[in-house]
Amino acid sequence: GEAVGLPAQQMGNSEVGHLNLGAGRVVHQSLTYINRKIKDGSFFKNKCFLKVIQHVKTNKSKLHLLGLVSDGGVHSHLDHF
């Protein structure tokens, strides 16, 4: 949950616990970071990603995206699919 940098009611794992253990502060996890960037719109303004999209459009080429899709919520989340 929020005490270890995850959304409320989101179960973590040992990795999340180890990252937060002794930090003296909340270590926000990737899930929280990505959620925040999507919510404030900055996720869709990433210069590197926009440059790649423009290259694909200009050159009529293909873009292959790889990633994780899981309901686990630590390394990936279904909401980001």
From Swiss-Prot:
Cofactor or coenzyme needed: Mn(2+)
Cofactor, free-text remark: Binds 2 manganese ions per subunit.
UniProt keyword annotation of Iron present: no
A GO MF term: phosphoglycerate mutase activity
Binding, substrate: H75
Positions that bind Mn(2+): S14
Involved pathway(s): Carbohydrate degradation; glycolysis; pyruvate from D-glyceraldehyde 3-phosphate: step 3/5
Active-site residue numbers: S14 (phosphoserine intermediate)
Key words, A-Z: Glycolysis, Isomerase, Manganese, Metal-binding
Leading EC class: isomerase
Catalytic activity: (2R)-2-phosphoglycerate = (2R)-3-phosphoglycerate
A Pfam family per the record: iPGM_N
Record's GO cellular component terms: cytosol
GO biological process: glucose catabolic process; glycolytic process
The keyword Transmembrane is assigned to this record: no
InterPro entries, A to Z: BPG-indep_PGM_N, PGAM_B_sf, Pgm_bpd_ind
E.C. designation(s): 5.4.2.12
Function description: Catalyzes the interconversion of 2-phosphoglycerate and 3-phosphoglycerate.
Family of this protein: Belongs to the BPG-independent phosphoglycerate mutase family.
Assembly and oligomerization: Monomer.
Annotated protein name in UniProt: 2,3-bisphosphoglycerate-independent phosphoglycerate mutase
Classification of source organism: Bacteria, Bacillati, Mycoplasmatota, Mollicutes, Acholeplasmatales
Name of the gene this protein is made from: gpmI
